[in-house]
A protein has these predicted regions:
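Extended amphipathic alpha-helical scaffold segments
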Residues: 1, 161-233
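Extended charged low-complexity segments that act as oligomerization/scaffolding linkers
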Residues: 2-24, 209-301
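Amphipathic alpha-helical scaffolding segments comprising HEAT/armadillo-like alpha-solenoid repeats
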Residues: 4, 34, 74-83, 96-101, ...
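Residue-level signature of the C-terminal ends
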Residues: 9, 13, 25-30, 67-72, ...
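Extended repeat-based interaction scaffolds and adjacent low-complexity, acidic/S/T/P-biased segments
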Residues: 38, 44-46, 51, 76-84, ...
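HEAT/HEAT-like alpha-solenoid repeats
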Residues: 85, 104, 120-127, 139-140, ...
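Alpha-solenoid HEAT/ARM repeat scaffold
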Residues: 93-97, 113, 191, 224-228, ...
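HEAT-repeat alpha-solenoid elements in large eukaryotic scaffold proteins
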Residues: 123, 127-159, 224-228
């Protein structure tokens, strides 16, 4: 080799030279061998030259794998591939990036099937140490110095490509890679991947059964959770009964419910079941649902403190995070444990109080302990009687309205002495009980003795739950030698902002263990009612009750075609900026009636595409103009308005016009609009009603002057949040009544149609801008007339001036005016009403 021209060229150039890279491609394609094997690395000239075998493998050879033809891969190629350097200190493995780049090439033997085979051969902990750490830190976008990573490129492509144009094999390869990417501990990366996966399933639903068969038994619950949450999101756009039946038959219901206890998977399975049931899909296992009412798991066995101490050194980070109230996971993420009682469903007819728990526990102990506890109860009773006697004696001689006696010691000297004697004896009795109880029950004994007189519901033992999570997270394979380096580098408290979405592998195991624990608890213990006013939480129904659903894969709506026709093209009266003003102009602006927009023009919008008119049923607009110069004499100008609407009986309209025109209409809760309680998925509506008590019923106006009239909202409001974060997501949907009465069906872009015509929409779902509710004027006017109903608008807002430099310090003088507008749609389709302004200056 050194003697010929190629050899001389190699001796003079680095492995990254373009010609060397070309040779690394052409030689295996033409001669079925690798360039690196043609070089005599023991030749003196190659020993002393700049070219190095390992560098050639790491650069030119590695590059060639991503561009060579599919027939240029051999066993020798695979051997050299395994020799590519993998710097352990960065946790980035170029070999995985190569496989991701090749993953979608159908004819390539190194496509996603190879990646799949490699990952399946590894046990879950080793796979997380090699693969999950890599994908957690290797998802980044393009910037001035770097091109986008292969992971980001693939996921973004999957989020935009017309999946229907891909072959079935390509769809399977894409889904395979996306599923394996969901094992990451990078939260944002996982969310992007799940959205791309749900989109794939929605556009290629025929492939869902393949992925169910191929991935339901993977030993990584992150992946299985993502699989079924994506399937659920996708099928909510399907109505093909044959397809849904095939999907239902392919799901291993029993195995997932009994062998993979995971409350997130159960939530997705329940959603799939409920949706299928709503369409009368056959082949559904009705005998298994609701899952928590058909127990299938063995009774929980909790490790004790000694069990945790035995493994604490090996899993110290997990123990710190999940094993106490000092760690964020144990304190905050596991807070929902308190929503269950400590009473097993098998032990009683309802959740027991602390008093009942104590009595049952000590009644089961030895006769000596039971006798000691009986004496404690007798002494407790005597103490309470003394307190009652003292209080009664005080009230006989004092006003019954004087509650200060609760804070006074009302006992006489004899009573005080008796109390001291009782307290001394109680301490003796409790110590005697502790001596006779086994050490394993010491903590429980102390808790029960302390709470023996409480009539509050006995909550689930959170410390026991924390120990369970620690033990099971550790048993998933967490080891210091595998993960501590990664966690110290990328998950420490001083990490840069772009790494904040990367979680510890240990936290992944904690999350999985908690999902498992909740599956057990939900079917074995009583739920503790929170006694909310608006929703019924008397029993456990699903994870939405404690905000445990993480993301809504159905929002924004999953588009299942390229159709954009018949979407409204709106021409509307805009009021989204303030004019340039001097200080004098500002004073006039805030006090002038003429600077209020004409709301009759705002609430009716023309549609260029269909010559239709739209009625604006809900909107919120806010505009602010702050002086750029901090020393300017100008004030900050703020302006906002809120548009509400509802329907009333036409016969009631005459009783509402005058009070409506004179009332303050600024309150954000002026009109009650049912919502999804931040946890019902966008596309679960209207088929599934997680909160039946929120169905719209006739409401009464809070304003006293309008309170004689009842109304109903035509809307439902969607927003999203879960236990770890809230989002700005908002959208409007038609009320169930409107859907039923106008026979509306859900469209491609979140719009609602009747007879193939869009009747209701929120333009925010297909174009940038704020969320608004629009309804076809023609359709709504006909509906109102047929049902003797009237549509009214209640609009309120304010204009405000203030000095931003002094406001926070001295609450400087504010110039302020409130305005309102009351409009209604008359029987001829005309908008009528008035608007007014009330000026108010305050300090």
């Amino acid at each position: 080799m050194p003697e010929n021209k190629v050899g001389q060229f190699l001796l003079k150039n680095s492995p990254g030279n373009g010609i060397i890279e070309v040779l690394s491609v052409l030689i295996p394609e033409r001669f079925n061998c690798e360039l690196v094997d043609l070089i005599d690395w023991n030749h003196p000239e190659f020993i002393s030259c700049y070219l190095d075998k390992q560098r050639l493998i790491d650069s030119a050879f590695a590059y060639s794998l991503t561009v060579r033809s599919s027939n240029a891969f051999s066993e020798r190629t695979n051997t050299l591939f395994n020799q590519i350097s993998t710097p352990s200190f960065t946790y980035q493995d170029d070999r995985f990036d190569i496989l991701i780049r090749l993953s979608l090439q159908v004819e390539n033997p190194w496509n996603a099937t190879k990646l799949d085979a490699v990952l399946r051969r590894l046990d879950s902990a080793t796979r997380d140490a090699l693969w999950s750490t890599h994908i957690a830190v290797s998802d980044y976008g393009e910037d001035a110095d770097l091109s986008a990573s292969p992971i980001r490129t693939l996921v973004e492509w999957a989020s935009e490509v017309d999946v229907c144009d891909l072959s079935g094999d390509s769809q399977k390869l894409l889904g395979t890679v996306l599923l394996w990417l969901t094992t990451t501990t990078n939260l944002k990366s996982r969310e992007r991947t799940e959205r791309a996966l749900a989109r794939l399933f929605a556009l290629a639903p025929a492939q869902i059964t393949y992925f169910i068969d191929s991935f339901s038994d993977i030993d990584d619950q992150y992946l299985v959770e993502s699989l079924y949450s994506s399937i659920y999101a996708a099928i909510l756009r399907q109505s093909n009964l044959l397809l849904l039946k095939q999907i239902a038959k392919s799901i291993p219901w029993a195995r997932l419910i009994e062998n993979v206890p995971d409350i997130l998977i159960r939530d997705s399975l329940t959603g799939i079941f409920e949706y299928g049931k709503s369409l009368s899909v056959p082949a559904l296992p009705e005998e298994m649902f609701p899952i928590h009412k058909h127990p299938s798991l063995k009774p929980l066995i909790f490790p004790n403190k000694q069990n945790i101490d035995e493994i604490r050194e090996q899993c110290s980070e997990i123990a710190r995070s999940a094993g106490s109230e000092f760690g964020d996971f144990g304190k905050y993420t596991m807070s929902m444990i308190n929503l269950w009682s400590s009473t097993s469903l098998q032990d009683a007819s309802g959740p027991q109080t602390e008093r009942e728990k104590s009595e049952i526990f000590f009644a089961k102990q030895s006769p000596e302990v039971t006798e000691l506890f009986d004496e404690i109860k007798a002494l407790d009773l005597r103490k309470s009687l003394i307190d009652e006697q003292a209080a009664s004696r005080y009230l006989e001689n004092n006003s019954t309205n004087d509650y200060s006696f609760y804070f006074k010691n009302l006992k006489n000297s004899n009573e005080k002495k008796e109390i001291e004697t009782i307290d001394f004896r109680l301490e003796q009795l409790q110590n005697e009980i502790r001596e006779k109880i086994s050490p394993a029950e010491s903590n429980r004994t102390d808790l029960l003795l302390q709470s023996r007189n409480s009539d509050s519901i006995s909550k689930f033992d959170k410390s026991a739950a924390q120990r369970w999570v620690v033990k099971h997270a550790y048993e998933m394979g967490w080891k210091k030698e595998l993960f501590s380096g990664f966690e110290e580098m990328y998950c420490n408290e001083f990490r840069p902002p772009y790494q904040h979405n990367i979680e510890r592998i240990g936290k992944k195991y904690e999350r999985i263990a908690l999902a498992q624990l909740l599956a057990y608890i939900s079917e074995q213990y009583y739920f503790v009612p929170q006694n909310y006013d608006d929703v019924d939480d008397s029993v456990y129904k699903g994870i939405w009750q404690f905000n445990y659903r993480k993301i809504d894969l159905t929002f924004p709506p999953l588009i299942t075609s390229n159709s954009t026709k018949k979407l409204p093209q709106l021409t509307e009266y805009q009021y989204n900026s303030l004019p340039p003003m001097s200080l004098h102009d500002q004073q006039e602006w805030v006090q002038s009636n003429t600077t209020i927009p004409n709301f009759s023009k705002i609430i009716e919008i023309n549609d260029q595409a269909s010559n239709n008119s739209w009625l604006l049923l809900a909107d919120f607009q806010s505009v602010s103009d702050k002086p750029e110069d901090r020393d300017s004499e100008l004030l900050q100008s703020d302006f906002w308005y809120r548009i509400n609407s509802c329907i009333i009986k036409t016969s009631d309209l005459k009783d509402l016009i005058v009070p409506g025109e004179n009332a303050s209409l600024m309150a954000p809760d002026l009109i009650y609009i049912p919502n999804n309680m931040h946890q019902a998925y966008f596309s679960e509506y209207p088929y599934r009603n997680l909160y039946p008590e929120l169905i719209t019923q006739p409401q009464t106006f809070e304003n006293k002057s309008m309170s004689k009239v009842t109304y109903e909202s035509l809307l439902r409001e969607y927003s999203w949040e879960y236990s770890d974060q809230a989002t700005e997501t908002q959208a409007y949907q038609p009320s169930r009544k409107l859907i039923q009465d106008l026979n509306l069906t859900y469209g491609e872009y979140g719009e609602w149609k009747s007879d193939y015509q869009v009747v209701f929409c929120d333009p925010h779902l297909w174009e940038q801008g704020r969320s608004r509710a629009l309804c076809s004027k023609k359709a709504l006017a006909n509906y109102l007339k047929e049902n003797n109903l009237s549509l009214i608008w209640l609009i309120g807002g304010e204009k405000r001036l203030f000095n931003p430099r002094k406001y926070l310090l001295s609450r400087s003088k504010l110039n302020y005016s409130e305005f309102s507008a009351f409009y209604y749609l008359d029987e001829f389709g005309a908008i009528k009403g008035t608007q007014n302004s009330n000026i108010d200056e305050t300090n």
